[in-house]
Amino acid sequence: MTLGLYRGFDYLTLRRWVKNVHGEDALRAIADKLAPLGYAGAVTDVILPDDWRPLAEYLEFNRAIDQVCGGEDAMMKLGRFSCDDQIKFYHRVAMRLMRPGWLLENSMALWRKYCDVGRWEVRWPRPHAATAYLYEMPLTEPTYCVAMMGFFERFLQLCGCRDVRLVHSECVARGGEVCKWEGTWR
């Protein structure tokens, strides 16, 4: 099984968030943390949105951001920023007109544009609740999963959902079979 590749677009989003919120010094500190692993290029290389880079590098980039920028709260904020950064204004207008369930199901179909491993499934235990499962992900990192939770939270808010509550109830990085996020909203 391949360890996977991740799209350059997301690397650029991570860099943008660190630079905007924490500054150039934080980017340099992250590059310094990644250098012994051979991944400083996540910060220093010219990366194009359509480039494919190692998933392991992307996950280590997330871990270094967590260490330099302040833990779980920072990763939730990064996830929310990623959603805002990647979903353009005209998409947001359309999102308000469609059902959150339909949008969530169809957005999961876009996964392969960002990562070449893993597979999403969404289940609906009741109308204002969903459980998202990420299967067949050879590597993951708890900080990445927290950022994903921030992304999901903001995504649902952009769909018009209120009082969004999410729990990452199972994680491959914590020994689980899958990564599982459970959410409710009004």
Where are these regions (language model features)?
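N-terminal leader/assembly segments
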Residues: 1-69
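Non-catalytic regulatory/interaction regions at protein termini and inter-domain linkers
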Residues: 4-9, 18, 126, 133-136, ...
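Short, well-structured alpha-helical interface segments that form or flank functional binding sites
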Residues: 25, 143, 147, 176
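Amphipathic interaction/junction segments at domain boundaries or subunit interfaces
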Residues: 47-147, 162, 170
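Conserved catalytic core of nucleotide polymerization and phosphodiester-bond processing enzymes
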Residues: 161, 185-186
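Beta-rich nucleic-acid/ligand-interaction surfaces
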Residues: 166-184
